[in-house]
Amino acid sequence: MDSFFADVSEFQAPVSDSYPYKILSIRVCDGTHQDSNFAQNYAWMRNALDSGRLDCGIVYTYVRPNWQDNANTVRQMIDANGGLHPRVVLMLDVESGGNPGGDGSAWINALYNNLAEYAGNPARIIGYANQGDFNTMWLSRPKGLRVIAASYGSNPLLPGQIAHQYTDGAYG
């Protein structure tokens, strides 16, 4: 069974009632940069979760080495917009673009631990990256971490993988 969902940030139009899927992923921030559509997207997500329109929400942050400021931004933005909904998971978007090279496990895991404490359960924190970034940036990952793998050519079947992001060349 396939489950489809979109990744929505300030680079796309805000989510609306035309959204067709049962899962939605929205960006809260890129480090300390606050996504300009987060409040609107999160309000829609919360209402859709409460009404049964959505089954699950994913709120993600593009991780940056200033992990404490990154964590504070995530917490403050969610708290300012109704708090963490019980059917929302937080996702760490781990990508090499704009981040220092090499193993970032120390600061990524510090962010993970901070947000796991905030969420009340480490199972509510998932990771996202392509195989190369997982293997170079996040060498030491928390035990039991579930991940979404970004791979457009083939399914990489990463340890803990729960989803595979790909493209079929179409867009809506």
Where are the regions a protein language model picked out?
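Conserved beta-strand termini and adjacent loop/short-helix elements that scaffold enzyme active sites
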Residues: Y62, D93, Y128-N130, A150-Y152, ...
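Short amphipathic alpha-helical surface micro-motifs
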Residues: A39, N72-V74, A129-Q131, G144-I148
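Functionally critical loop-and-helix segments that line ligand-binding/catalytic clefts
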Residues: M1-S18, W138-G172
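Glycine-rich, charge-decorated loop segments at or immediately adjacent to ligand/cofactor-binding or catalytic sites
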Residues: W67-D69, D133-K143
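Intrinsically disordered, low-complexity segments enriched in small/polar residues
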Residues: Q40, I58-Y60, I126, H164, ...
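Substrate-binding cleft of extracellular glycoside hydrolase catalytic domains
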Residues: M1-P122
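Aromatic-lined carbohydrate-recognition surfaces of secreted/lumenal glycan-active proteins
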Residues: C56, G120-T136, R146
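Surface-exposed, flexible loop/turn segments at secondary-structure boundaries
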Residues: T32, P65, D133, N155, ...
